[in-house]
Amino acid sequence: MSGEGKRLMVMAGGTGGHVFPGLAVAHHLMAQGWQVRWLGTADRMEADLVPKHGIEIDFIRISGLRGKGIWAQLSAPIRIFQAVRQARAIMRRYQPDVVLGMGGYVSGPGGLAAWLCGIPVVLHEQNGIAGLTNRWLSHIAKKVLQAFPGAFPKADVVGNPVRTDVLALPVPETRLADRSGPVRVLVVGGSQGARVLNQTLPGVAAQLGERVTIWHQVGKGALSTVQQAYQDVGQTQHKITEFIDDMAAAYAWADVVVCRSGALTVSEIAAAGLPALFVPFQHKDRQQYWNALPLEKAGAAKIIEQPQFNVAAVSEVLSGWDRATLLTMAQKARAVAIPDATDRVAAEVSAAAGSRATHVAHG
């Protein structure tokens, strides 16, 4: 379907969990002839990342309120009003046919500005429990979409847009069929690393010995400390890296993943068709727990909460999963995945833009 001449503004910022799905949808629609601009903040990751993808970005000034001091709370209405005014000026200048909100603080003023300008707002919630901004915006949005069931009572479940190289991986039965030898355990801490994984996994390696081979991504600045921890328990055969540039290749190598359960990570693991042991980040909304729960319920993963995540517990779980079990879990993970999430979100964006065109034509 051609989007020739149609204009989209994507609002997303702060973290990769918001920005990467937005980029996936943006590229999909640009390939159909859409023009895309981005609304973000100048001091977060989108400021550098989005222009690298050939998308122009506009900035407004806004930051989060949770955990801020009394002066920040008192001045918040003024700052929000100013951010809405900035966003409205940008909307009037660019005149998008539709606005896609992917989360982050920028979506609040941006969504309100779009609504004030009569531009339809499509929202996408990546997590299993809705963020504050999206909960608020859902009341004025034309369409609300969710990656996992339960974030909103009536929203369509469309999954999270996932990178094409992960979607292109062979299905589990092809990938895992002829494997033998030690179980390949991929440990992913994210760009910042996860201290609980870095502290626990060397002990797990010592406990399980020759039964596993580990590829442990430790995060920024933790390489020498974690390497030393593996050496101290006589486990020097494992691969320890600070970052992983090619996650699709890492998923292809792995038999099982041990990681946090951020929304995008969970969606990628399902799309790849991989069993997982999740240790959710201890957030007051328990966001990561709710992200991981559908995979645990499907029999594709196990959740161990951080206070219970220790050498004995992790070793017991991993040693209980033989290759036949891992293949079954991998197939269950793939069955839960929504591999066409990008198409689904893009279709809803197109529909909302179409409804505005009809409305304007008949207005």
UniProtKB/Swiss-Prot annotation:
<dbReference type="GO" id="GO:0005886">
    <property type="term" value="C:plasma membrane"/>
</dbReference>
<keyword id="KW-1003">Cell membrane</keyword>
<feature type="binding site">
    <location>
        <begin position="15"/>
        <end position="17"/>
    </location>
    <ligand>
        <name>UDP-N-acetyl-alpha-D-glucosamine</name>
    </ligand>
</feature>
<keyword id="KW-0472">Membrane</keyword>
<dbReference type="GO" id="GO:0051991">
    <property type="term" value="F:UDP-N-acetyl-D-glucosamine:N-acetylmuramoyl-L-alanyl-D-glutamyl-meso-2,6-diaminopimelyl-D-alanyl-D-alanine-diphosphoundecaprenol 4-beta-N-acetylglucosaminlytransferase activity"/>
</dbReference>
<dbReference type="GO" id="GO:0008360">
    <property type="term" value="P:regulation of cell shape"/>
</dbReference>
<keyword id="KW-0573">Peptidoglycan synthesis</keyword>
<comment type="function">
    <text>Cell wall formation. Catalyzes the transfer of a GlcNAc subunit on undecaprenyl-pyrophosphoryl-MurNAc-pentapeptide (lipid intermediate I) to form undecaprenyl-pyrophosphoryl-MurNAc-(pentapeptide)GlcNAc (lipid intermediate II).</text>
</comment>
<comment type="similarity">
    <text>Belongs to the glycosyltransferase 28 family. MurG subfamily.</text>
</comment>
<feature type="binding site">
    <location>
        <position position="163"/>
    </location>
    <ligand>
        <name>UDP-N-acetyl-alpha-D-glucosamine</name>
    </ligand>
</feature>
<keyword id="KW-0132">Cell division</keyword>
<feature type="binding site">
    <location>
        <position position="288"/>
    </location>
    <ligand>
        <name>UDP-N-acetyl-alpha-D-glucosamine</name>
    </ligand>
</feature>
<keyword id="KW-0133">Cell shape</keyword>
<keyword id="KW-0131">Cell cycle</keyword>
<dbReference type="InterPro" id="IPR007235">
    <property type="entry name" value="Glyco_trans_28_C"/>
</dbReference>
<keyword id="KW-0997">Cell inner membrane</keyword>
<feature type="binding site">
    <location>
        <position position="191"/>
    </location>
    <ligand>
        <name>UDP-N-acetyl-alpha-D-glucosamine</name>
    </ligand>
</feature>
<keyword id="KW-0808">Transferase</keyword>
<feature type="binding site">
    <location>
        <position position="127"/>
    </location>
    <ligand>
        <name>UDP-N-acetyl-alpha-D-glucosamine</name>
    </ligand>
</feature>
<dbReference type="GO" id="GO:0071555">
    <property type="term" value="P:cell wall organization"/>
</dbReference>
<dbReference type="GO" id="GO:0051301">
    <property type="term" value="P:cell division"/>
</dbReference>
<dbReference type="GO" id="GO:0030259">
    <property type="term" value="P:lipid glycosylation"/>
</dbReference>
<keyword id="KW-0961">Cell wall biogenesis/degradation</keyword>
<dbReference type="Pfam" id="PF04101">
    <property type="entry name" value="Glyco_tran_28_C"/>
</dbReference>
<dbReference type="GO" id="GO:0009252">
    <property type="term" value="P:peptidoglycan biosynthetic process"/>
</dbReference>
<keyword id="KW-0328">Glycosyltransferase</keyword>
<feature type="binding site">
    <location>
        <position position="244"/>
    </location>
    <ligand>
        <name>UDP-N-acetyl-alpha-D-glucosamine</name>
    </ligand>
</feature>
<protein>
    <recommendedName>
        <fullName>UDP-N-acetylglucosamine--N-acetylmuramyl-(pentapeptide) pyrophosphoryl-undecaprenol N-acetylglucosamine transferase</fullName>
        <ecNumber>2.4.1.227</ecNumber>
    </recommendedName>
</protein>
<dbReference type="GO" id="GO:0050511">
    <property type="term" value="F:undecaprenyldiphospho-muramoylpentapeptide beta-N-acetylglucosaminyltransferase activity"/>
</dbReference>
<dbReference type="InterPro" id="IPR004276">
    <property type="entry name" value="GlycoTrans_28_N"/>
</dbReference>
<dbReference type="InterPro" id="IPR006009">
    <property type="entry name" value="GlcNAc_MurG"/>
</dbReference>
<feature type="binding site">
    <location>
        <begin position="263"/>
        <end position="268"/>
    </location>
    <ligand>
        <name>UDP-N-acetyl-alpha-D-glucosamine</name>
    </ligand>
</feature>
<comment type="pathway">
    <text>Cell wall biogenesis; peptidoglycan biosynthesis.</text>
</comment>
<dbReference type="Pfam" id="PF03033">
    <property type="entry name" value="Glyco_transf_28"/>
</dbReference>
<dbReference type="GO" id="GO:0005975">
    <property type="term" value="P:carbohydrate metabolic process"/>
</dbReference>
